[in-house]
Amino acid sequence: MGLGTTTVPTNILPQFGLHRTHLNPIRVNNSTGFSYPLSLRKNKSFDRLVCFAVDDEIREKQQQQLSTSSTRLGSAVEERPENKDMIDGISEEALENFKEDGERSAIYDFLYPSKELLPDDKEMSIFDHLEELRERIFISVLGVGGSILGCFAFSKDLVKILEAPVKSEGVRFLQLAPGEFFFTTLKVSGYCGLLLGSPIILYEIIAFIIPGLTKEERKFLGPIVLGSSVLFYAGITFSYLVLVPAALNFFVNYAEGAVESLWSIDQYFEFVLVLMFSTGLSFQVPIIQLLLGQLGLVSGDKMLSVWRYVVVGAVVAAAVVTPSTDPLTQVLLAAPLLGLYLGGAWMVKLAGR
């Protein structure tokens, strides 16, 4: 038939708000195509009814749902290009702001200098860099090795120089094991050779990194290297003249009247050499401050504002660096560390950082 119908059970009519009285049940004659109304009583023999009203209501609800979904889908499709353009605009704007901030940052300029600022810049492969690094390490090892051999030739004289701070206190040194003095002279020669060969190591490091430095950085490199070297040797000298005698005299006076001072030659030189080198390294505090100020990471005012924490940090650093546990040595090292920090902070502030 041309007319579409739907057959439904009678027990679902209340779900659509319909009752038997609202419908006009129709029976279809399949042979003639004629339909005529039936009473509900007569319809009890049939299991199903042909209900046009229910079919129309279901179809109307389905059409409403489809139209609503189509409207929402169309709105989403229309709004999508606008949202995409807006997101792309925000991303491009954020990227431009990031680039502008990076160009104004000292760290960005340090990591990505322009080619005009690199006079000796040239393209090199990773293997060329490794080859150059190998050569410079080899030269540094040769320089330090030669210095160690030279110091070993005068090892006994160096031992006497390092024994001088406590010679006047009546301290005697003993060799407690076979070959202890021989290995002690090797240790003294190694430390002294490293000290004398450090300029060669420093030169090779500078020669390796200087092609990647700008003109402004090269101007800044000279004072940094010179200041670092001066402070390192000043720290060693300060340790030999002040810290070592103070610490050793403290131990001698503390044991006076109770025990005789007979010290192991190996442990004595280990104590003295470690104290001297750790003091030289701790004197590099102003250099670190200048580097941080030059990069714009910390200002001079900020360094000066945290001086209370610096006092505590200097005492803790002195306790860690010094191999002895006496408070006198720690105070004698903490005081110059605090002075160096304050001096470095004022230098950064005067430099306009």
Curated annotation (Swiss-Prot):
Question: What residues does the transit peptide encompass?
Answer: 1-50
Assembly behavior: In thylakoid membranes, TATC and TATB form a large receptor complex, containing about eight TATC-TATB pairs, which binds the precursor protein. Twin arginine signal peptide promotes pH-triggered docking of TATA oligomers to TATC-TATB receptor complex, inducing a conformational switch of TATA that results in activation of the translocase. TATA dissociates from TATC-TATB upon completion of translocation.
InterPro entries attached here?
Sec-indep_translocase_CS, TatC
Q: Name one GO cellular component term.
A: chloroplast thylakoid membrane
Q: What does this protein do?
A: Part of the twin-arginine translocation (Tat) system that transports large folded proteins containing a characteristic twin-arginine motif in their signal peptide across the thylakoid membrane. Involved in delta pH-dependent protein transport required for chloroplast development, especially thylakoid membrane formation. TATC and TATB mediate precursor recognition, whereas TATA facilitates translocation.
Q: Where is the composition biased (Low complexity)?
A: 63-75
Region (Disordered), start-end ranges: 63-86
The record, for Pfam families, names: TatC
Stated family = Belongs to the TatC family.
The upper taxonomy is: Eukaryota, Viridiplantae, Streptophyta, Embryophyta, Tracheophyta
Among the GO biological process terms of this entry, one is: protein import into chloroplast thylakoid membrane
From the Swiss-Prot or TrEMBL record, give the protein name.
Sec-independent protein translocase protein TATC, chloroplastic
Membrane topology note? Multi-pass membrane protein
Per the record, what ranges lie on the membrane's Lumenal side?
158-192, 245-270, 324-330
Q: Which residues lie on this side of the membrane: Stromal?
A: 51-136, 214-223, 292-302, 352-353
Q: What is its main location?
A: plastid
Q: Which gene encodes it?
A: TATC
**What GO MF terms are annotated?**
proton motive force dependent protein transmembrane transporter activity
Q: Where is there biased composition of kind Basic and acidic residues?
A: 77-86
